[in-house]
Regions:
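Glycine- and aromatic-enriched membrane alpha-helices
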Residues: 1-248
Length: 248
């Protein structure tokens, strides 16, 4: 399967693992009764900005050398992130009546995730479309799909990373550039449909592997030391209860 920088092994894997962990851990105390909205959007924007810039190294570095392919990977990473942030904000405005800073940051991350498997295989046009699609689908992932799954996925690991990784991995088989593929010496399936099916198989295998292995690992940890802190520690916050410090 085509996966340039880890759309399957990093994002689908971690997103599915997060969902399994959320089910096994259970919901946070007070969820649904207390406001749990992000309380420091300044840190959110700073963090998203650092991730955005760092992703250039993540995707560009997967070319394993400074050259045309690395440059294109960095360019399409920027394009996809911007396109996804835009489409996310548009959908958010339509659905909720207003766009938000948090939405813009989430949309950018969605675009970064979506382009990860495709960064070394697509051009600017393909990256733009993938970003636009990814922003919309990931918004659905953290809203309607999240409600359907009924999991307390606090950081939207599944809705952003797993869903975004799935979208990116499948669309890589749709929007790859023949010119870039040939220049890189990548061997594809004999037909377009065949390559697309390989992408779907890769996604499915990653989901199954991650879900099973995560369940086994967490089950063992739960039997040995447990995977959830006490209710008092949870309310106090893990920074303070586990480490004796807190950043206000």
């Amino acid at each position: 399967a085509l996966d340039f920088a880890g759309g399957t092994v990093v994002h689908i894997n971690s997103g599915v693992a997060g969902l399994v962990a959320a089910y096994m851990l259970g919901k946070r105390t007070g969820l649904g009764r207390e406001s749990m909205a992000p309380h420091n959007l300044t840190l959110t924007v700073v963090g998203a900005s650092l991730i955005w810039v760092g992703w250039f190294g993540f995707n560009g570095g997967s070319a394993l050398g400074a050259g045309a392919r690395a440059s294109m990977a960095i360019l399409v990473t920027q394009v996809a992130a911007a396109a996804a942030a835009f489409s996310w904000l548009v959908v958010e405005r339509v659905v909720r009546g207003k766009a938000s800073v948090l939405g813009g940051a989430s949309g950018a991350v969605a675009g970064l995730v979506v382009i990860t498997p495709a960064a070394g295989f697509v051009g600017v046009g393909g990256a733009s479309v993938m970003g636009l699609i990814g922003g919309v689908v990931c918004f659905w992932g953290i809203t309607a799909l999240k409600r359907l799954l009924k999991a307390d996925d606090a950081l939207d690991a599944f809705g952003l990373h797993a869903v975004g990784g799935m979208v990116g991995a499948v669309l890589t088989g749709v929007f790859y550039s023949d010119e870039i593929i040939k220049a890189a010496g990548v061997v594809l399936a004999p037909t377009f449909a065949g390559q697309l099916w390989i992408q779907v198989e890769g996604v499915s295998a990653t989901i199954a592997y991650s879900a099973v292995v995560t369940f086994i690992i967490l089950k063992v940890i739960d039997l040995v030391i447990g995977i959830r802190v006490s209710a008092d520690d949870e309310r106090m916050g893990l920074d303070l209860s586990q480490h004796g410090e807190r950043i206000e």
